[in-house]
């Protein structure tokens, strides 16, 4: 998909909002989304490339965040998808803010560098069986386990650091400024100490690349998971719907997907490499002969 991650995430949340509202007012028998895929359009509509990016999948039938949201509303197959790469360079000021998890898991255990920091399950989309789950607390229990802080001290510091993520240090509401003052007096901490904790547990600046694991839990058992880290090894993956085509009164087709994935089998979104496709024998390419991933 060509849209930014912000737009793909926002699109998925708008789908969730509409379906949630339709279910909770008891006046709708169903809801139909627009639409399945991005599509070509005329010059007076769509984006500058004359493509309408309304689809929950792109023009090549590759799923966006919204497709994973809809997929999470069923019970047959396990679904877990994180709306972020967790790379701080994708965010203004390196602050991730709120990340969303689209899943039909009962809960999600979150690990940072192989250490469990929290378990998530609640969603603001209360009318949905499996509403999107927000995640913004990248600190979890680490102030207790890593810094050795008592729980009361850890909780108030964590609350203040997370508030700095939401509002920025320059725009902190008065109540958080008062809490920071209390922390500095009560625990004899300096502003420099706060900056160190913020950089270590929130922004990640100057530290070793982080690895995040989102482990889905179904019926008290681990199922599918998503692991996100700084990629260093890419590989090519080719998938096809079928290996056999049948000749009949018409013609048969199969869909072939070409992906560049990282070592955790996540898409490499910046690997926009050219691909040339050639066929031989009694088959023909029905798509583009030259395209970018």
List where the protein language model places each region:
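Short, aromatic- and glycine-rich surface loops/edge beta-strands on solvent-exposed regions
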Residues: 144-159, 203-221, 293
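Edge beta-strands of extracellular beta-sandwich domains
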Residues: 119, 220-237
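Extracellular Ig-like/FN3 beta-sandwich strand-entry sites
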Residues: 207-211, 251-253, 272
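Extended substrate-binding grooves/exosites of carbohydrate-active enzymes
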Residues: 1-195
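Short, solvent-exposed loop/linker segments at the N-terminal edge
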Residues: 88-94, 243-254
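Beta-strand-rich structural segments
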Residues: 99-103, 252-269
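Short, well-ordered beta-strand segments
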Residues: 54, 115-119, 271-284, 288-290
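Low-complexity "stalk/linker" and mucin-like segments enriched in Ser/Thr/Pro/Ala/Gly
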Residues: 125-139, 239, 281-293
């Amino acid at each position: 998909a060509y849209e930014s991650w912000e737009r793909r995430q926002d699109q998925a949340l708008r789908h969730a909002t509409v379906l949630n509202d339709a279910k909770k007012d008891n006046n709708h028998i169903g809801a139909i989304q627009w639409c399945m895929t991005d599509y070509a359009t005329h010059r007076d509509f769509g984006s500058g490339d004359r493509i309408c990016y309304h689809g929950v999948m792109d023009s090549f039938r590759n799923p966006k965040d919204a497709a994973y949201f809809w997929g999470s509303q069923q019970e047959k197959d396990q679904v877990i998808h994180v709306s972020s790469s967790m790379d701080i360079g994708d965010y203004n000021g390196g602050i991730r803010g709120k990340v969303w998890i689209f899943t039909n898991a009962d809960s999600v255990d979150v690990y940072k560098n192989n250490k469990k920091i929290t378990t998530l399950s609640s969603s603001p989309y209360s009318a949905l069986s499996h509403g999107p789950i927000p995640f913004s607390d990248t600190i979890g229990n680490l102030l207790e386990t890593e810094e050795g802080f008592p729980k009361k001290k850890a909780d108030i510091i964590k609350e203040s650091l997370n508030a700095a993520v939401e509002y920025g240090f320059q725009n902190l509401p008065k109540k958080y400024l008062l809490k920071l003052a209390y922390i500095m007096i009560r625990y004899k901490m300096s502003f420099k100490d706060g900056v160190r904790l913020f950089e270590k547990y929130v922004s990640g600046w100057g530290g070793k690349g982080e690895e995040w694991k989102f482990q889905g839990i179904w019926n008290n058992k681990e199922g599918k998971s998503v692991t996100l880290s700084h990629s260093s090894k890419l590989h090519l993956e080719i998938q096809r719907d079928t290996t056999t085509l049948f000749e009949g009164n018409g013609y048969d087709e199969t869909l072939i997907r070409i992906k560049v994935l990282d070592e955790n089998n996540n898409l490499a979104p910046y690997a926009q490499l050219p691909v040339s496709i050639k066929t031989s024998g009694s088959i023909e390419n029905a798509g583009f002969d030259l395209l970018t991933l």
